């Protein structure tokens, strides 16, 4: 079952603004090498991320950039629940996880929303890799996703004992996350040829 229509090969982009208007979060999605590459910014943390996903929105790699041209954190999975760093270190505490969660962007919730084959009223629980941008701490937290209706999802954090209902568009992209973000722009973007090239040509931080 497919929840939302497939995105076109020309890609997709979105910008969200924090409800206080102080920060923006962006994502640009490109189709390449039989999968999706998401390049995003975290305005509140002055950081950038890259998430490499399969055609079915399964996370394969995650890169986080803060102050350096090289990634501060680079995680990858073999597609069977085993996680490690790109230097070869096996992160056993992450094994079995499927998704990445970043506090500073609604996009990491778009990934399970588009991937999970849920009917209205159904739920799915899974362990999520939660990353603290400031400290680079990586913690596994259980979350539950429930599809309320065609354009509304609820996700519940067992660790925080709280839930959030978000509104999504026809593509499953978050348009409104109460008390956190509201989407201000959405557009189709051009095709990128090489995802590593995106890393090399990602926008430089201003001093």
For each predicted feature, which ranges?
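Solvent-exposed helix/loop surface patches that form functional interfaces
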Residues: 1-24, 72-154, 158-159, 175, ...
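N-terminal ordered "arm"
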Residues: 6-51
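A structural detector for short beta-strand units
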Residues: 23-27, 47-51, 70-75, 143, ...
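Short, solvent-exposed coil/turn segments at beta-strand boundaries
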Residues: 30-36, 52-59, 77-80, 148-150, ...
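Beta-strand secondary-structure signal
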Residues: 37-39, 50, 63, 152-156, ...
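Secondary-structure transition/turn motif
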Residues: 40-44, 64-68, 87-90, 156-162, ...
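Hydrophobic/aromatic-rich structural module bridging two neighboring secondary-structure elements via a short loop
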Residues: 42-87
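C-terminal structured interaction module
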Residues: 158-207
């Amino acid at each position: 079952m497919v929840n939302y229509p497939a995105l076109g090969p020309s890609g997709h982009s979105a910008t969200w603004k924090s409800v206080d208007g102080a920060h923006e979060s962006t994502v640009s999605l490109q189709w390449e090498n039989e999968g999706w590459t998401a390049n995003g910014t975290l305005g509140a943390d002055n950081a950038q991320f890259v998430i490499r996903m399969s055609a079915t929105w399964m996370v394969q790699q995650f890169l986080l950039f803060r102050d350096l041209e090289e990634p501060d954190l680079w995680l990858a999975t073999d597609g069977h629940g085993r996680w490690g760093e790109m230097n070869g270190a096996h992160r056993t505490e992450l094994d079995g996880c499927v998704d990445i969660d970043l506090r500073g962007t609604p996009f990491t919730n778009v990934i399970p929303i588009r991937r999970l084959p849920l009917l209205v009223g159904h739920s799915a629980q899974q362990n999520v890799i939660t990353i603290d941008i400031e400290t680079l701490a990586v913690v596994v937290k259980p979350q539950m996703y429930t599809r309320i209706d065609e354009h509304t999802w609820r996700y519940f954090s067992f660790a925080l004992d709280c839930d959030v209902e978000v509104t999504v568009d026809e593509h499953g992209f978050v348009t409104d996350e109460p008390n956190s973000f509201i989407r201000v722009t959405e557009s189709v973007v051009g095709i990128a040829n090489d995802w590593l090239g995106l890393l090399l040509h990602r926008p430089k931080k201003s001093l």
